[in-house]
From Swiss-Prot:
Keyword annotations: Aminotransferase, Lipopolysaccharide biosynthesis, Pyridoxal phosphate, Transferase
Family: Belongs to the DegT/DnrJ/EryC1 family.
Gene: vioA
Activity's thermal dependence: Optimum temperature is 37 degrees Celsius.
Positions of post-translational N6-(pyridoxal phosphate)lysine modification: 184
Enzyme Commission identifier(s): 2.6.1.33
SUPFAM superfamilies for the chain: PLP-dependent transferases
Function: Catalyzes the conversion of dTDP-4-dehydro-6-deoxy-D-glucose (dTDP-D-Glc4O) to dTDP-4-amino-4,6-dideoxy-D-glucose (dTDP-D-Qui4N). L-glutamine can also be used as amino donor.
Pfam family, one: DegT_DnrJ_EryC1
Entry protein name: dTDP-4-amino-4,6-dideoxy-D-glucose transaminase
Catalytic reaction list: dTDP-4-amino-4,6-dideoxy-D-glucose + 2-oxoglutarate = dTDP-4-dehydro-6-deoxy-alpha-D-glucose + L-glutamate
GO function terms (MF aspect): dTDP-4-amino-4,6-dideoxy-D-glucose transaminase activity; pyridoxal phosphate binding
Pathway stated in the Swiss-Prot or TrEMBL entry: Bacterial outer membrane biogenesis; lipopolysaccharide biosynthesis
UniProt keyword annotation of ATP-binding present: no
Amino acid sequence: MEKPIFVTQPNLPPLEEFIPYLEIIWQNKQFTNNGPMHQKLEKKLCEFLGVEYISLFNNGTIALITAVQALGVKGEVITTPYSFVATAHSLVLNGLKPVFVDIDPKTLNIDPRRIEEAITPETQAIMPVHCYGNPCDTQAIADIAQKYNLKVIYDAAHAFGVEDDDGSVLRHGDLSVLSFHATKVFSTFEGGAIVCNSKEMKEKIDRLKNFGYIDETNINIIGSNGKMSEVNAAFGLLQLEHMDTFLRGRMNADMFYRQKLKDITGISIVIPSGQKISNFSYFPILVESDFPLSRDELFNYLKNQNIFARRYFYPVIPDFQAYLNVGEVCDVKNAREIASKVLCLPMHAELSSDILEYIVSTIREIK
């Protein structure tokens, strides 16, 4: 395969469909500060996702940082070691102590049993991650939070459009945070959002992302600049028009992989758990000891064949140099083992059957 096959690529609607949105922005001469595109996208996303309130951000990391501030969390926050570093960064940048507990080796999400074991008088919140879009055990986490009077902020960066038996997974917890980065199922180039359940919280979040302003002459809280631009919001509106097509393409790729890889000795496929509607955001496999190559050897072998998989998430967060003396690390042996075996295969809406067959046959031919 001459053309490189990347682990992901952005969903791009026809360029000519984006031009009318840009023309409206040029006519309005408002590029940011809660403009009409921004307002329309918030409304459309609430409808699409089935949530009450949403506040758009310039990226998911600023949204995570702001979510912590909106709830006034102090002290310790229990979270997963198996995630992108922005999860823990949002805590450390707020002066909080992350406490890393282990994951369930089947779902790859934070293990509720480990959460309860790690609670101390300093614990104020839990920050779980719906890893790869697979919902956490939200009921168990809610029960723990209620028992110990803890806040729950879900890092839902992977979970756009995911539903469980209760509806949108974004409705769980006190707040849920989305990422609209170019690599995500739904993208605004760069972007993010906080989903909340009350008008009062939505207003507080909106103030926090706009320097704390109440009106032109009053600030009652110290905030930052987390606003999404009109161009980003416009692209999001256009993306929504094509979401069914994008999701169908990802679903077809997911089904192809599951069918073709299921009987390869030494390759384990992560089984979806808890979702009624999936977004097929990633396709992780686990390279076991009885496969002819190690995970890293397979990673390099695929790269030599122009297939660029990714080791999401390796290493676990507390094993990064920046975290060696930060927070507290409980026994996270499951997370470390999964991190040593995981490999995410290319997954996006435009993977043709020929490309998928090439990826699968490249893996199958390894002896």
